[in-house]
Design a protein with these regions (language model features):
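Regulatory and interdomain segments flanking nucleotide-handling catalytic cores
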Residues: 1-279
Length: 279
């Protein structure tokens, strides 16, 4: 068998499964933590500062290192990135919008960057404890003394647990094309999911599953206020509706606009231009 014939035949098998996104159309990559319900089991509830910071830093690094990325959004254990390839007529798409390469590399990047970021967060937290300068407790840390977060907050058990699992996090990824008109709607969809996750997380912190059974989001908010005296609207914005990443182009004198993390994004349905200006 001639080597050239073997090579050609094998390449045909490989090529037949390739898929490409549509050029000159926005692309969205979303990475999700694999089995993060288990991964986050021993973290501070209802929200873990170090986990949240690590996710935001992962988003930042991905925005900085993925060609054509113009906007990032993260909530819970997921990151959504918006890519464009039409800034100029000669602008190239990231890996020619090869879906296999986009998803495999994006998942690998998220896994690596998250491990690095979480390690940095845990190490910094341990140093503060050693120096007897613990980070300020979250607004939930002392609400219920019998809750898991009260037991592990500021405790070496928490640090040991985090260090044991920091390199166990894995991410999957998907990539798809969307019309320009739908990019904002896609981010609205994810932000609405963030709001739902946030309300449910706080509800689960204070109430049992049976108490929350069949309760709507508005009913959970009412329970939080009437029974726990907690106003969900007073929670920090990044815990209610996620965080975003984009270039700071306010100073036109700069040669390169730096990427920044916005921890207090607006409600997207009320300010569509917040996203659409980048598309």
């Amino acid at each position: 068998m001639k080597e050239s014939n073997l090579h050609s035949r094998m390449k045909r098998y490989e090529t037949s499964s390739k898929a490409f996104l549509m050029r000159r159309t926005p692309a969205i990559i979303r990475v999700d933590g694999k089995a993060f319900h288990t991964f986050t089991k021993d973290m501070e509830a209802p929200f873990d500062e170090r986990f949240r910071n690590a996710m935001q830093q992962t988003m930042l690094k991905m925005c900085q290192n993925i060609q054509g990325c113009v906007f990032g959004y993260t909530q819970s254990d997921e990151i959504s990135l918006v890519l464009t390839d039409y800034e100029t007529i000669t602008t190239d798409a990231w890996y020619d919008y090869n879906v296999q390469k986009m998803t495999s590399i994006a998942a690998s990047m998220a896994t690596l960057y998250f491990a690095e970021a979480l390690r940095a967060e845990v190490d910094a937290y341990a140093i503060r404890l050693t120096a007897e300068q613990p980070a300020p407790p979250s607004q939930f840390a002392t609400e219920r003394s019998n809750h898991q977060s009260s037991r592990i907050q500021g405790n070496n058990e928490y640090i040991s647990c985090m260090r044991a699992k920091m390199f166990a996090a894995l991410f999957d990824a998907r990539a798809f094309s969307v019309p320009k008109e739908e990019v904002c709607n896609c981010m609205i969809w994810r932000q609405q999911d963030a709001t739902r996750n946030s309300i449910q997380s706080v509800g689960q912190y204070y109430f049992s599953q049976s108490q929350l059974n069949r309760k709507s989001l508005s009913q959970i908010q009412e329970m939080l206020w009437t029974e726990a005296r907690v106003n969900w609207n007073d929670i920090r914005t990044e815990w209610k509706r996620g965080a975003c990443c984009y270039r700071d182009n306010t100073d036109s004198s700069k040669a390169h606009f730096p990427w920044i993390i916005d921890k207090a994004p607006p409600v997207f349905t009320q300010n569509r231009n917040y996203i659409e200006r980048w598309i």
